[in-house]
Amino acid sequence: MFFAAALCCIVSAVMVSCGKDNPDTPEPEPTPDPEPEVPVTPKDTVVYAVGQEAVPGKGYYYATIWKDGKRILLSDGSYDAFCNGAYADGETIYIAGCEATGDLVDDGYYEPYHQNVGVIWKFKAGEEDKAEKTVISDGKYSTSPIAVTVADGKVYAAGFDSPDYDRRAILWTDGQPQYLTDGTTDALAYCIYSDGKDVYVGGYVQPASNKQGGIATIWKNGVAQSLTSGNTVAKVNAICVDGGKVYAAGSEKESGGRWKGVLWIDGVAQDFTDYVGTEVTGLYVKDGEYVIEGNMTETNSAKDICPYIWTSAGAQKVAETTLCQGVGLAVAGNDIYVAGNEVAGYDSEYNPINIAYLWKNGVEQELEVEYKNDFSLWGVICAYVEKK
């Protein structure tokens, strides 16, 4: 599926002959000293899965990460919190998420609740207990940063807020928001990717002329590019840049219909599934070979949702689960990690049982949990850290 690059060194020997009786024969150039070899630092692959775990008896969640399966809490359980996405910049890890610590809302319909505030956690791998938290919204409106990246020394996050019924897509730069849409129609930002100094955000924008439609959209450095016309509902859920080409994976459907999977390469669409309820949450591309991750149904029934990956060779089911969504992808060498969430039934009090999974090459990995009936993942990354 993936092709490892091999490094070949070709050494040429040049024979120089000098005639002793010819005074015009130039002296040979001195052989330069060889460049010193730069030692390669051995690296370990560390896998971070991010999400949430229920605080027992409280009805809300801890913001939780799992480092190689070990559970680590980023919140103290005194309020609702969760992690949406992550990024590794060398050995520095960034987590995008939310905490319900904003303005109190009492609308008369529900129990009073606090608005979600957008946050970014930052820590060095191995120093998770020293995580620094940066709040990136004021708590006035519910705010959700979904994804995070780093480019040219700056931290970028993509997500949305909800000042009214229609949401606004947002790009944050070092905590400062740039509104990609103005809120006059609905819009969401689902993903972010950096390539050099360029930052790409993927999502959707509802056209003003068709409230039943949705335009799959990429914002490059804040400038929007529409991938669809708005006559259908379409969205970009994951972006990669490889070989100078921009790959965007997402879904498209007719209003009221079922989703099909779409991969856009430099804006040109190619379908990778039929209209079978396909959702995308991950994309990896190297040397033109892609891996798309998400879920789809096999029988057009919502009860038959399974996690999948798609490559140029076709579709591959990740696990034999039902009512299970694929929610995250990471690739390290030839290893493929997929995160998923399953609705596994109901407990004795008719509360849904939510169980998260992390698979490595299709094999379930152990996740440490204290409350096994209600925990979820929303992303997974691989970090490369120096061997101790």
Regions found by a protein language model. Name each.
Residues M1-A4:
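Bacterial N-terminal signal peptides that target proteins for export
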Residues I10-T45:
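Bacterial Sec-dependent N-terminal signal peptides
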Residues P39-K388:
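Residue-level hotspots at or immediately adjacent to binding/recognition sites across diverse folds
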